[in-house]
Amino acid sequence: MPSENKTSLSPWLPAFLSLIIPGSGQIILSHKTRGFALFLAFFALLGLVLWTQAYALLAPLALLLIWIARDAYRLAKGSEPSWGVSLLLIGIVLYGTALIVTEVRPTRMITGLPNVTPYLRSLFNPELFETPMKEVVGVTPIMVPCVDPLPAPNREATTSPQLILSAPCTEVGDLLQVTGAGFEPNESGQMQWIDPLGSPRRATFDGEVVTFKADENGRFDVTLLVPQAVPLTAQPAPGETLTHAVRAVQNIPSGRLQPTQTLSLVIEKIGETIALAFLATVMGVIFAVPVSFLAARNLMSGNPVTMLIYNVVRAILNVIRSIETLLWAIIFAVWVGLGPFAGTLALWFHTVAALAKLYSEAIESIDSGPIEAVKATGASWPQMVIYAVFPQILPTFTSFTLYRFDINVRLSTVIGLVSDAGLGFLVVQWVRLNRFSAMATALIAIILVVAILDFLSSWLRERIIQGRPIISSTNPLVRTVLKTVIIVGFVATFIWSWNVAQIKLIELVKGAPQGLALAREFATPELFTRPTKTVAISAPLTVPCGAAEPSTPADATITLSADCGETGDPLVIEGTGLPPNRTVSVRWVLPDGGYLRVRSNCCDTDDDGNLRVETAINPIVVMEEGQTEPARVEITYEEIAGRIQLSETVRTVIRLSIVTLLMALVATTLGALFAIPLSFLAARNIMGDTPAGRTIYYGLRTFFNVARSIEPLILVLIAATWVGAGPFAGVLALALNNIPNLGKLFSDSIEEINSGPVEAVTSTGATRMQSLVYAVVPQLVPPFLAFIIYQWDINIRMSTVIGFVGGGGIGQQFRIWVSLNQYGAAGTAILAIVIMVWTMDYLSAKARERLI
């Protein structure tokens, strides 16, 4: 449709300009936002294509350039602007490069199925309960080989049960008849051969493992082959023999069904998980409440000083929140050591920032009337908070606290991935040991714990928000007793959690110097560097004297007190004309290039660039037979050889940040593609009230709730086994996590649509599919897009940490740097994560505002 914004310019001019500089034609036509967006999009995509060397994608990029020029032409002609074709071309290039960067290879999902199959099977075979087993064992010795005279065996035979052999000695490869008596009647068992060292192996006959089943009298007869149990190199000397043994074993159920050791350990770790979450939440509230008042604009807007405090506090809270809890766990583990204490500190630190932000926003949204009324009485700031603010915010604060406790429980299940606390620690260990059934037990426990606590916290939040009392009884005595029980239970739980978390404040104090030094290194990111070259000056040293003549003389700026000598002779090394106040290295250098420092932590030049080192001749420089060139004494130092440039750390961080962003993008897209069709099947108003509809609805809703309980970090462990460690594993884990999350959000939106348009379309005789397309979908596009952007925002945060367990991205490199004590490089990664999260958070918030 023609537009009234027609320009007097020739439409070919802006089209030509946009062909030369993409977006410039739109800018001169006063479509500045559109022009800048196209400019940035084109060159960002061009950079991705060149970086990935995916030159085939230059074709759609060229088509995009032509479209940009055509768009400028149409705008100049007065046509309405559109984005359809451009978004398609941008998507082709963007997702093409993203699939390359994230190493998405669908074929690996097929070839890796044998690796992941044990995980899937184990979910149906968890180690929950077992029956105690009684072991019935019969053993009898036998000599191999036979000798004359035959010595007595050096081990005793059992008498009940008893094994009787067809011969007291035998040879390797012979058949041996074994009769058993006194065994458990009508029970099966297995035969074993015990070598002289006591190591058992399965007995065989005709290539099959020998088993037996005792008759009603507890007797059996079997034949087995005498194995080569002793290596040929360890055979006894002629005339000597070794004592072997034949062993029969029955494992018989004995006693009642009882929890397995795995389940008992999981239950113990469940308590630890809840304790960490509870303690972190309680301590977080204690610190977050006062901080939240300092972060509330309506309470701090009185003067420039309070506004400065407000801005500083807000900035600090945003930085802390931008860094995922697992990153904090690594940092605190360096500070106070591995263990529950480090995990609790990480949860607490992040909880303070998260709750303080939520609390401050609640404070900013309160009614200002009571505040003004209290201020008018001349009340102080603390009085205003107590009498005008607290009564309004207490219900909201309580609701936010329960919500955060729910989050902390989920985080506590994975905090063990970087420490030895919580259920996550068990999951990691069992995955590494290929104990899949034990891992399944832990996963089931995580799902149940999260689901139960999620239900309880949701129930409490609902009652608090609705203003309904938690204790519904009106009997004063009952209410008093229940309140007392709650208070005593809270205190007891706090003490128990404190002990479980192994809180040792003295360790925090002892580690403070190291922690502060660590903080300084993290706060000094490695942003820039200058190329250097190594400068070396040297002088020959012949040991012993007269052994050889050096072919290269000494440099003019280095002198030795002696040109030759013997091992241990004193030697003074002097250097002149060196850079002043510079650390240099002084070393013995061998003709083959090997070297040894003269002294550790050596040495620094003085203000005039002079150096003097007193030492003794080291044995390493003694000339060997056939050696024609003596060793040398060398002074080396680094000299700047170029301009300031971005450090290699920054280059690595930028590259991995792009990988992280694209991982989040691909995972969000895959999750949305699968979640959209499933969400319609999980919406009650779409599925109807038929038996089949209800079955599908409840089945999918249950799947969503169960799958959402498993944290992406645990899914990464499985995905890394499936397709191999790397970005693809991270994408796969995030996508699997996104499907239930987005599916639930989408289905809730579908259930909340306006029924009016649906009824209107249905009344025309439209089918269910037509009603869906023309009455339902138009209402769902804005909220669906908003949820997808919201999930992408979450995925960006998660992408920064899933690399800890094989998911690729910047998190994997961060952990490597920390493990190598390269905290400056790790600080650079932290800075990049904060910038990335802040930027994407801002952009996604703006996008959601426009959509909603």
Where are these regions (language model features)?
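N-terminal, non-cleaved signal-anchor transmembrane helix
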Residues: 1-12, 31, 46-282, 286-290, ...
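Hydrophobic alpha-helical segments
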Residues: 10-63, 404, 412-416, 426-451
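Short helix-to-coil transition segments within interhelical loops
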Residues: 29, 366-369, 373-393, 419-421, ...
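Alpha-helical membrane-interface segments at transmembrane helix boundaries
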Residues: 267-275, 279, 313-320, 406, ...
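Membrane-embedded alpha-helices of multi-pass transport/permease systems
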Residues: 287-290, 327, 342-345, 349-371, ...
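Generic hydrophobic transmembrane alpha-helix motif, especially the helices
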Residues: 306-348, 687, 693, 700-735
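Glycine-rich helix-loop "coupling/hinge" segments at transmembrane-helix boundaries
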Residues: 334, 406-446, 465-466, 721, ...
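Transmembrane alpha-helices
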Residues: 380-416, 437-449, 453, 457, ...
